[in-house]
Amino acid sequence: MHVLLITQYFPPEIGAAATRWGDYVQILIKKGHRVTVLCEMPNYPLGTYFPGYKRQWVKQEKVSPNLTIIRSFAWANNRNSAIKKLGHYLVFMFSGLLTAFRLKNYHVLIVSSPPLFVGVIGAIISKIKSIYFFLDIRDLWPESVMALGEVRSKWVFNMGKKLESFIYKSTNGYILTVPGFKKHFTNHYPEQLNKPMINLINGVSNTFFDLAKKYDRIPEKRFAVLYSGNMGLAQGLESVIKAADILQKYPIDFKFVGSGVKQKALKTKADKLGLKNVVFLPVQKKEELIKLIKKASVCLVPLKNNPLFKKAIPSKMFEYMACGRPVIVSISGEVTEIIKKAKSGLISSPEDANSIADSILYYYNNRGKIIEQGRNGVMYVKENVRKEVLISHVMKKMQNAINKNSTL
């Protein structure tokens, strides 16, 4: 099958969005599928073009006989204001749409959202070219941006809902990163429930497992708590800084690895509290990040205490588990059931510094549980969320859906 994938973020960019399809595309290629990726000129998360790229309209990369990456113009900026963020999204929507018009001879179109504007490309292209269109939903926009306070205007929110409705009406099927997203359709778009809805969570690839096995665990000299990834509005990392303050008298270090809009504020807060047990590290390449994860004693998976995040399943959780690290999850919802089933961590109350600190102290005082629950996590990931198995299931479901609608 020849797949046209449209996603704003793609490697060498980093983050959950880029990693999701970066991994799945490689697996599809190995399984004999042909993939064309349409994405932005890489600039995320720092807002500057990656080495080897520049401000240009389009760049085509023939990676292999079965993989072509087409990078379209993007407004590279630091997205530190609503105007810059909106401009970043809209510029790719228009450049991506114009670039997509030239592409042909593919069997199915997959568009990954958010940003929601990428879905507009899929809606228009699928209509013009009469191609089967699957929308990959990684997060619920505009609800999530409203919940985080990035959008406060009801008018803007309502416009976002109209855009969402337009895109949904244009799709032939859905790929859901979180199974719980189906409830969103039940509550708001019940007419869409007759379309195929295929679950594809962010699991762990064989490549990641191989890298995790490659490096022996060399633990830090002191007990180490690690958070890696986006330091943004959704994570509620202020509560982790408070937990570090509570635990100052213990020989416990906190490591924050990554970047994001809240990083500066978190550093400032740590400095004001005089925290000597908190360290911030920049974004790391995958291999270096795996080394840091394996060095840690425990890893954190926090989110803000918002009903919207009850459906969230952060991909970093499975990566921590694959590295044999127990996780402290500060989320209420679907994730807690996974942790209970896997017996691979503890559950703390979201945005509750005392609860997070108590969970950290549990592992500090029970080192044997670190080994036991770490092993449980590895076993769970291997048996339940291997990306190779997950994407094979999706492709079969997609092919069945296309066959049933062959007159499209």
Segments from the language model and where they lie:
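N-terminal subdomain of nucleotide-sugar transferases
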Residues: 1-63, 202, 407-408
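Carbohydrate-associated surface elements
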Residues: 180, 200-203
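Membrane-proximal helix-turn-helix segments that form the acceptor-binding/catalytic region
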Residues: 94-101, 117-120, 124-128, 154-174
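Conserved donor-binding/catalytic core segment of Leloir-type glycosyltransferases
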Residues: 217-235, 240-244, 255
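Conserved acidic donor-binding segment of nucleotide-sugar-dependent glycosyltransferases
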Residues: 341-342, 346-353, 362-368
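A short, well-ordered alpha-helix in the C-terminal region of glycosyltransferases
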Residues: 355, 362, 369-383, 396
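Short hydrophobic beta-strand element within catalytic cores of glycosyltransferases
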Residues: 298-301, 319-322, 326-330
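Nucleotide-activated donor-binding/catalytic signature segment of Leloir-type glycosyltransferases, i.e.
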Residues: 222, 251, 255-258, 264-291
